[in-house]
């Protein structure tokens, strides 16, 4: 019985070692995400991206583009999507965000207070749908343009979430799953999320004594 018990221990340790080896091999084989998207992007049909099971017969080109790639990366979110964007007026990007929200993905948005009510802003529709939105309360701009997908991938660059930026301007987005970089952006988002908590706003600041 004692010998059999020892063999069970040895077999268990061997199985654990094999599992760890397989895990390490998988991690080494996993291709890191290192990608750059450049804009402007050609106008293409995005319906197959948003709804892959539906057919679309619109006259727009049904081809890949930097914009469709951006949508695909965002729609990968399974648990959470944190957006920190200066201005958000692109209806197609709003559709993607609302689609994630409808799937139960936790979506949080931080934006600039001066631009959230600008003409064409999508912040109102997002809030109406129940998406959590916070904004700054300062004279300086909240000028970030980044997104964190599931806490594992960061999309960051010069791109404002506007039609002009995606279709007209020279812009870029860097995508990476580097853990150090993702952690830094996640921490910055959480820091701003707490800083912009409406409960901490001073709506009636006292005038300085002169």
Curated annotation (Swiss-Prot):
Location, primary (coarse class)? mitochondrion
Q: State the CDD domains in the record.
A: PLDc_vPLD6_like (cd09171)
Give yes or no: UniProt keyword Nucleotide-binding.
no
Give the UniProt entry's GO cellular component terms.
mitochondrial outer membrane
Q: Which residues form the active site?
A: 143, 145, 150
Per the UniProt topology annotation, the Mitochondrial intermembrane ranges are 1-6
What disulfide bonds does the UniProt entry report for this chain? Answer: none
| GO BP annotations, alphabetical order | lipid catabolic process; meiotic cell cycle; mitochondrial fusion; P granule organization; spermatid development
Query: Where does this polypeptide localize?
Result: Mitochondrion outer membrane
Q: Where is the PLD phosphodiesterase domain?
A: 138-165
List all topological domains (Cytoplasmic).
25-210
Q: What is its EC number?
A: 3.1.-.-, 3.1.4.-
The record's comment on protein family reads: Belongs to the phospholipase D family. MitoPLD/Zucchini subfamily.
Q: What is this protein called?
A: Mitochondrial cardiolipin hydrolase
Gene it is expressed from: pld6
């Amino acid at each position: 019985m004692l010998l059999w018990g020892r063999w069970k221990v040895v077999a268990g340790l061997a199985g654990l070692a094999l599992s760890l080896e397989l895990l390490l091999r998988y991690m080494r084989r996993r291709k890191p995400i290192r990608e750059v998207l450049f804009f402007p992007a050609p106008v293409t049909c995005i319906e197959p991206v948003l709804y892959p099971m539906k057919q679309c017969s619109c006259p727009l080109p049904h081809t890949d583009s930097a914009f469709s790639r951006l949508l695909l990366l965002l729609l990968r979110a399974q648990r959470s999507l944190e957006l920190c964007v200066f201005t958000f007026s692109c209806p197609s990007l709003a559709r993607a965000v609302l689609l994630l929200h409808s799937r139960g993905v936790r979506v949080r948005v931080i934006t600039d207070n001066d631009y959230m009510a600008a003409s064409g802003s999508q912040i109102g529709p997002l809030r109406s749908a129940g998406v959590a939105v916070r904004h700054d309360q300062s004279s300086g701009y909240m000028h970030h343009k980044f997104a964190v997908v599931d806490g594992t991938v960061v999309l960051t660059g010069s791109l404002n979430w506007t039609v002009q930026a995606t279709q007209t301007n020279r812009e870029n987005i860097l995508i990476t799953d580097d853990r150090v970089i993702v952690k830094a952006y996640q921490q910055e988002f959480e820091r701003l999320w707490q800083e912009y908590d409406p409960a901490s706003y001073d709506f009636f600041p006292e005038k300085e004594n002169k």
